[in-house]
Amino acid sequence: MAPLVLPSVLIASAYLLSTVSAEPNVAELVGTWSTKSAAVLTGPGFYNPVNDTLLEPTHTGISYSFTEDGYYEEAYYRAVSNPAKPSCVSSIMQWQHGKFVLNADGSLSLSPFSVDGRQLQSAPCTADSATYTRYNQSETLQKYQVYTDPYTKLTRLDLYQFDGTPVNPMFLAYSPALMLPTETLNPTTSATSTSSSKMKRWLGYGDEPEEPTTSEGYLLPLNRNAKHISRGIEQPSLINRIDLDLVWWAGVGLTIFGGAAYLL
């Protein structure tokens, strides 16, 4: 019986190690993940909270970002085909951020900041303009997998929806994550920033920005001077800030003035 003891112990140890290694681990989720084209990325390149606008990427795609302290951000850009009229392709852009929980069973529970989500729907064949609205949708992801893709050799993330339907595979694009501030960016009368101390750390100042006037319960327009929003948003270059029309007319004026001075 003694010779059988060692193999049994080894088998039990191997099983224990495999069980431990299979436990959910937030650290492996940390970073910004994007589908293959990498055209869609979370952060200020997709949603600009200063102007409250969604920025259309060059290609459709999905991006998720996660932090080790339990915050997430997601960006979706999808095309919706029209079988009856193939030339009439609609599009949907969605952006959310908030908090997530990695559950013991490996599932993910995503709870967005309810007032911050944005959705832009465009149907050029049925509407003269796009529809821009607030968007708030909690999510449950049944499971996830992080591994090295055997074909691309890149770190890959597979997410599965609540019913087990796989989301398009994503690959690690940034680590640490490329994200907007992990707090409420567009507070309303019924929702405030996540933490005043956290806000102050972002701002670097002791006072929070004043709230603009309200309209139908929403703060409109957004506080464009709020440093916790504008920080990290790329400012336009000097060339982009120059009024080219003004330069042209100034050139015309100098030419006329020079010609008149020459004749005199």
From Swiss-Prot:
The lineage of its organism: Eukaryota, Fungi, Dikarya, Ascomycota, Pezizomycotina. GO terms for biological process: 'de novo' protein folding. Residues 23-243 are lumenal. Residues 1-22 form the signal peptide. Required for normal levels of the cell wall 1,6-beta-glucan. Involved in a protein folding machinery chaperoning proteins acting in various physiological processes including cell wall synthesis and lysis of autophagic bodies. PANTHER family: PROTEIN ROT1. It is a single-pass type I membrane protein. This is Protein rot1.
